[in-house]
Amino acid sequence: MKILSYTIKKGGKSMKIKSYDIKLKEYEQYLSSLPFICTEKIESEKTVFVMVDIINGFIRGGVLHDKEIENIITPVKAFLEYCKRKNIKSIAFSDCHSEDSCEFATFPPHCIKGSNECKIVGDLSKIGGFEIIEKNSVNGFHASGFRKFLENNMNKSCYIVCGDCTDICVLNFCLSLKTFFNEINKSAEILVPINMTETFHAEKHDRSFANISALSVMETNGIKLVGGIEINE
């Protein structure tokens, strides 16, 4: 792929900026300008709230945890409380692996079944009102618990998805769910509030780039992005 570059003046010095840097900045600005959706526009009887891996092992401790992900808990908590009041169906995926999980060929051992890492963070578990679905891969769509839930809730046409990590488990689930509905020719909306999703930062995994890239891929595939959810009652 050919990468163009532009020369700009900064502090009396010439600097070259690659075109993809400019495009990323433009998309980042676009994301920051996304409007919030009001709860008045959410049809309770048609909606499912999905929380992906908001668990101790990715937020509070463990080899793959990142404390920055903690920032999503406040808006997630507020909407979960709203869902409980309005009887909106809610589910929470929990990464839960056997000690010989095939996924450990890609990621270091984490969230072993029965450990504290698999538990939903206390801020949300205290609220309750949601079904916990264990998963053994980065894609909760394939979990038997979710396939059963989906089969029993085909009347739902709006899935609001949040959690971590934006570019791994959230991305995989959203794409699979969207393409499933497309395959059976069912009109359904997958909605992602970007202030309720986050990913980790590491030497070869830039948080900002990973978030922006994943959100762009989701939007390209028909998933609706919003800045967040404004709760009005």
Whereabouts are the PLM-identified features?
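Solvent-exposed loop/turn segments at secondary-structure junctions
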Residues: G57, H97-E99, T166
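A basic- and aromatic-enriched beta-loop-alpha substructure that forms the phosphate/nucleotide-
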Residues: A92-G114
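Active-site-adjacent betaalpha module
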Residues: K2-V48, P109-E233
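Short coil/turn segments at secondary-structure boundaries
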Residues: V63-E70, F107-I112, S137
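Short acidic, Gly/Ser-rich segments with clustered Asp/Glu that frequently serve as metal-coordination loops
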Residues: I54-G62
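A short alpha/beta connector and helix-capping loop motif
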Residues: E45, F49, G62-C96
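Active-site loop/turn elements of alpha/beta-hydrolase fold enzymes
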Residues: I54, D95, N195
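Short, conserved acidic/polar surface loops in the N-terminal third of protein domains
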Residues: G61-G62, S101-A105, A143-G145
